[in-house]
Amino acid sequence: MADSGPASFWTRANAILRKNLTYQKRNIWSNVRLIMIPFYLCIVLVFIQALFDSQVNNSLDNQCGCQCIDKLGDGKCQMTCGLEYSTRDQGFFCAIPKPQPWPPLILIPRPEYRALDANFTNDSCRRKNSCPVTILFTGNNHSLGAVLSRNLLRRPFAMNSSDLLFSLANNVLATTFKGSATNYLDAGIVSDGSIYNIQPRCPPNSNFSISIGQSPLNFTKDMRCVQGLNLWRNNSIEVNLELFEGYHKGNSDGMINEIVAAYDLFDTNMTNFNVNIWFNATYKDEARNQPYKVVRVPRLVNWVSNAYLQYLQGPRTKMLFEFVKEMPKPETKLRLDIASLIGPIFFTWVILLLLPVILNSLVYEKQQRLRIIMKMHGLGDGPYWIISYAYFLALSTFYIIFLMIFGSVIGLKFFLLNDFSLQFSFYFVYINLQISIAFLLSSAFSKVETASVAAYLYVFGSGLLGMFLFQFLLEGLSFPRRWIFVMELYPGFSLYRGLYEFSQNAYQGNLNGKDGMKWKYFSDNAIDEVFYIIIVEWFVALIATYYIDKMSSSGKDLLFFLKNQNPFKISHSLQKQVSAISVEMEKLDVIHESEKVAQLMLESSTSHAIVCDKLRKVYPGRDGNPPKKAVRVLSLAVPSGECFGMLGPNGAGKTSFINMMTGLVKPTSGAAFVQGLDICKDMDRVYTSMGVCPQHDLLWETLTGREHLLFYGRLKNLKGVDLNQAVEESLRSVNLFHGGVADKPAGKYSGGMKRRLSVAISLIGNPKVVYMDEPSTGLDPASRKNLWTVIKNAKRHTAIILTTHSMEEAEFLCDRLGIFVDGRLQCIGNPKELKGRYGGSYVLTMTTSSEHEKDVEMLVQEVSPNVKKIYHIAGTQKFEIPKDEVRISEVFQVVEKAKSNFKVFAWGLADTTLEDVFIKVARTAQAFNVFS
């Protein structure tokens, strides 16, 4: 027996937890395959890494250059490695115990790209390679700017071979070659290009050769003079416009007019030095997934600083920038880790693959109506969401842990170099956000196929957009950081950003032999920003999911609080409806039922389990169609212990009535009470005492019949011995106990067995109210009779509302019947009363040859002048004879008389059946509706 009162929150949570654990046990291999996905993907990375190592990392081009040298002069050579034996690319990997000092160089445009317009010079200089290099000035003090611009280029070229670097530091040297990743070898010096000396004017014979560097890194370079041209601009806007128009996409002609640098002196004066420098930052990261290159900015800073010092102290004051020099380094090897290079997009896909799994599971229960049937049997929203969330969180956590373990075991630097606890914390908060998003999205989908397509588009779209759009903008220095923050509000990009930071730290750590990201550097990376975004979005998604679910359950529009309804308009509309109702004709029995309901509404008694008072349901019109009145005005009272049957043609409104009573839709007007509880306000409490047998079986294919009943029994607060006893009795009563049928998966049941299980589910726990929609559909005669007995026994302490198309079923089970046509009760009473009221005639059937049809009709009319022929085809005729005008013996006499005059093949006399009553009432009601 059930405990007194409904099941508690934790009892219901325990019920669904046990059901889910059993369900997952049946699907254990699906879960194993899901958790093994990271392993398979990590193995793919291992093979890619091995291929990359053989072709790239271990290539001779990516190692320090070596030659076989005869050091002892004995004809035997020894393999010797060093910078002197290396190409420019190989030199990066060589040991450099004493790095070379190199003179600092300024980056200037190549001759064919130097700035050219009417303010500078004509285009003939490009043909002669003699265009000057341009430096722009602006600021608040034009005269000060003129002095500083002159000081930049006032020094004549001077050389002192005894101290070459000191001598070169007195000059302004430049190159057209961009910087490398390091300064171990300066590309401007080791290349074949010339070194340029920027002068105010280039005198004759100003080009010569010079030797730079120490053996073995000694290079002879051509020193060429290039004219420097300083130009003043009124403000920074003009400078920005000029720089932009010098870009080949910044002007309509596609011309390139590059400027060396630009200086904004702001409010610089004798006591304040404040300067802003424009330089071309695109050279820093023009090669994606490569280390940043050195940008030649320090010499630009030193250049203008010297000009300012000379403005203050005179031309002899100098602050020399003699050289740039790297720190010593050991020999290294190329150690490019594929997992770190492609980690952001790869692991974005790996982690996001959980989203379709979660979303499909939620939408499947929604599509198959499993969630609503659980709710109808007492499972509240709270236990459902908490247990579902906990399950998906556990599954996702195992998935992430296995991903980290597999990645570490096979040696992926992405996992080994970054702090494990930091990684897990990031993944953990994100999978919580992902589960919340899946819950939120599940409200937008009703079909698994649609949800699956949308989810996979999100997965792969997020990875591709992250790599080709978000990462491009992230690495571009010109893109505003605030817009990066806005983009990170998209969950796919916040995940990508976190993985990008992990990959960059692992890549740099592996390249330099250091660790990756650690907690102590948490605030130094954007990872802290991403953490905060994910946590906030996690809670926002949970709140939004709760709100949408509550609004959907209550039937309210999501934006109901924005809608302002006109009370006068509503009351006027109701007045019109009431006046329309008042002129409709109602039968006396229906009026008596309405009066009984009105009396019950005034009383506080709960003797009647179900009370419906003027219940209406109108569906709004769509596509220009008028509103559909599914249930017009329904007043009904069903006491406990009664089975009330609803008969009616398709579209009569029976299903809409059941949907209102089970909470699927809200009534348009009127009221309904179950055990004294209002279905519009207390539906969650109503569910705890309700059982439902839907028209279509809503079962889990992998759960057994016993497991179904155990789950629903727990929802009805059955425990221990009472639970097991109730389950066993239910299985026996519907003939699902013997032969091991109870422990077979429901997916292997026949249609009839599933139907019997659905009836058993609706009756377990002795619910106070049960709704059954065609419970015996698809059953063989023996099973049908057995099931009817079960239902009849169950109604002793239960109010049952049953819909059926079987008149035999209705007559056997129902204490009272109501015939429903066009949304309205046409009659109500027990089967005998209805047959007596609407069936006051006998039906005589007689089959003869066609030529005797008129003779038969004349003989029957002799018995009663009010006889009515209701059927006629190929010699077979049916006549309806009023009972009050004829005796049965008189009918027999007519038959005997007919037999004596002609051959009668067959005949029969029957009382009116319930089916005849149903047809008669339905036709009369439909005819009246058409007429009205």
Curated annotation (Swiss-Prot):
**Pfam families the UniProt entry points to:** ABC2_membrane_3 (PF12698), ABC_tran (PF00005), ABCA12_C (PF24526)
Q: Where in the cell is it found?
A: Membrane
Which InterPro entries does the annotation name? AAA+_ATPase (IPR003593), ABC2_TM (IPR013525), ABC_transporter-like_ATP-bd (IPR003439), ABC_transporter-like_CS (IPR017871), ABCA (IPR026082), P-loop_NTPase (IPR027417)
Locate the transmembrane regions by residue number: 34-54, 338-358, 392-412, 424-444, 453-473, 483-500, 526-546
Membrane topology label: Multi-pass membrane protein
Superkingdom of origin organism: Eukaryota
Instruction: Say where the protein is mainly found.
Output: membrane
Amino-acid positions noted as binding ATP in the UniProt annotation, renumbered to this chain: G648, P649, N650, G651, A652, G653, K654, T655
State the UniProt keywords alphabetically: ATP-binding, Membrane, Nucleotide-binding, Transmembrane, Transmembrane helix, Transport
List the disulfide bonds in this chain.
none
Family, according to the entry, reads as follows: Belongs to the ABC transporter superfamily. ABCA family. CPR flippase (TC 3.A.1.211) subfamily.
Q: What is the name listed in the Swiss-Prot or TrEMBL entry for this protein?
A: ABC transporter A family member 3
